[in-house]
Amino acid sequence: MSEDLRPSGDITTALIKNNKKIKAKIISNQNCVIGGLSFAKEAFKYSDKKINFKTKTKDGKKIKKGKVVAVVCGKAKAILKSERVALNFLSLISGVATITKKFVDKVKGKSCKICCTRKTSPNLRSIQKYGVKLGGGLNHRFNLSDEILIKDNHIAVDGNIKEIVRHAVKNKKGKKITVEVDNLNQFKKIMGLKFDRVLFDNMNIKNLKRGV
């Protein structure tokens, strides 16, 4: 909210003379998995604690285009001041949840899991990863301390994939180890070492099948 209200508040809404009580509906403009209702509520409450935010569905539910997601009642100025932040939360989290659900549905019935990465927007990781969970996906590591992930850049700096994996095994301290490989030759070098997972990076389908 501070992004919108600094330094001088909502100077456009301030022009409205009649600060009457209004009722607004939040309506889905497409089929989606809804997410972010509690965040939207807090955005409105930040503007005015007296605003009533009544949900018509729950996070994680699949809804149809045209569905009323929530009804907001309160003073007009307070609602106008916070509507965009509330909708941004709903749009972002619902968008992540919806696209995740599409991937989850594609692998339904197979021994596959859809996981997310750390490639998130700064300061929004928890929110975006929450969207992944709503869509049925799984969260990979949240930060650099959660798991050892030996990537191509680590290998490029160290120069010896086998040695860096061995070093990781000796110093893992209960953490899981994932190793990224760019080709099958790299994979062969670390076969037999006690790491937990391998990440096949940008491989074609033929080599990916061979690797699996």
What are these regions (language model features)?
Residues 202:
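Short secondary-structure boundary segments
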Residues 1-193, 197, 209-210:
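Acidic/glycine-rich phosphate/pyrophosphate-binding loops and surrounding catalytic core
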